[in-house]
Design a protein with these regions (language model features):
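Short, basic/aromatic recognition patches that contact phosphate-bearing ligands
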Residues: 1-91, 173, 326-334
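A structural signal for short hydrophobic beta-strand segments in well-ordered beta-sheet cores
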Residues: 63, 185, 215, 277-278
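General beta-strand recognition
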Residues: 72-74, 157, 193-195, 286, ...
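Bulky hydrophobic/aromatic content
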Residues: 81-167
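Polybasic (Lys/Arg-rich)
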Residues: 234-334
Length: 334
């Protein structure tokens, strides 16, 4: 009985063996496949393996017979090729909104799409920078609930956390309950955002999904996005997110900034929670960070208008003065 059952699942184990143990550089002969099957308590003859391989090929598997580097078979095509798995793995590892635990789970699943030899070449998969990873293990459950609410046109209720300054330079987290009409989710600048409308206001808002907890779908229809945006029939996520700016680069220097407490979230999003904060008052705080002094950094600082003042270096202060004077000249002409 066990032998008959083994023969019924033999094809499944053969494709498992070819998937996990073969690639272009590592074919397996029919005899070797028989030996691998024996590890699963399945007996097979070498000649029968040829028929089994042909059945799998007829079904659609891209199994190649080769004589280089030795006689044997290997699985030539997979659902995801090696560079695709590497690319997806890098995206998962660098995504700040995916926790370290979930990152390891996802990259492990991606590795199972490769042969064991290909997986060994994925050296990058060993390293995960956990310093900026979220600790929110609810993330994927919340994404599923939010997606369901969007599909059903229902409002959602959740708690939303944000960083605040407490007792001098201590950064802590506070949470508030919100009811939101969800319209879309988007991945921007290493974070996953919910785009929606907070019921108290007549505009759109972007909320970091890694800061969302305890999502509840309400039995209440959403407020239509046409009431709070210029979109009518379709909410155009690509158009909406086009205004977001990207990363900056250049020569690294120590930059000391004086910031309004109102933009603590934006500052820690950009530079992380480990920034060294000094000179805290009821209105402002100072911090020093290594940053690229470039036109892009000038743009980022000026985006916050009077909420950021550059203390040092003088070079950066001068760049901002010059940019402000150039803008002023344009508007003085009119």
């Amino acid at each position: 009985m066990a032998a008959r059952r083994g023969q019924k699942v033999k094809l499944l184990y053969i494709i498992k063996i070819l998937t996990e143990l073969t690639d272009e550089d590592h074919p397996l002969s029919a005899t070797e496949i028989c030996e691998k099957l024996a590890a699963y308590d399945i007996t097979a003859e070498r000649k029968a393996i040829y028929d089994d391989i042909n059945c799998l090929i007829d079904f659609g598997y891209d199994i190649i017979s080769t004589r280089v580097p030795k006689n044997g078979y290997f699985l030539a095509s997979r659902d995801f090729e090696l560079p695709e798995v590497f690319l997806l793995g890098d995206a998962v590892r660098t995504a700040k909104f995916i926790s370290e635990k979930k990152t390891r789970e996802l990259t492990s699943k991606l590795d199972r799409l490769l042969s064991k030899y290909q997986s060994k070449r994925n050296i990058q998969g060993i390293y995960i920078d956990s310093s900026n990873k979220t600790h929110n293990e609810e993330l994927f459950y919340n994404i599923d609930r939010i997606n369901t609410a969007i599909a059903e046109g229902k409002k959602i209720k959740f708690t939303y956390s944000k960083r605040v300054l407490r007792e001098g330079r201590q950064i802590t987290t506070e949470s508030k309950t919100r009811v939101v009409s969800p319209y879309a989710m988007t991945w921007q600048f290493d974070y996953y955002y919910l785009i929606g409308n907070y019921e108290k206001y007549n505009n759109l808002m972007n909320l970091r999904i890694d800061r969302i907890h305890s999502v509840e779908i309400l039995d209440e229809p959403i407020r239509h996005f046409r009431e709070v945006s210029d979109y009518r029939d379709t909410f155009d996520v690509a158009d909406y997110t086009k205004k977001l700016f990207g990363m900056f680069g250049g020569n690294m220097q120590e930059v000391k900034l004086r910031c309004s407490n109102k933009i603590l979230e934006q500052v820690t999003d950009r530079f992380g929670d480990s920034i060294f904060i000094t000179n805290v008052t009821d209105a402002t705080f100072d911090f020093t960070v290594k940053a690229a002094v470039s036109d892009a950094l000038v743009t980022w600082i000026m985006n916050y208008e009077d909420k950021i003042e550059v203390i040092t270096p003088t070079e950066l202060r001068d760049k901002i003065k010059n940019r402000a004077e150039q803008i002023l000249k344009i508007y003085k002409k009119s």
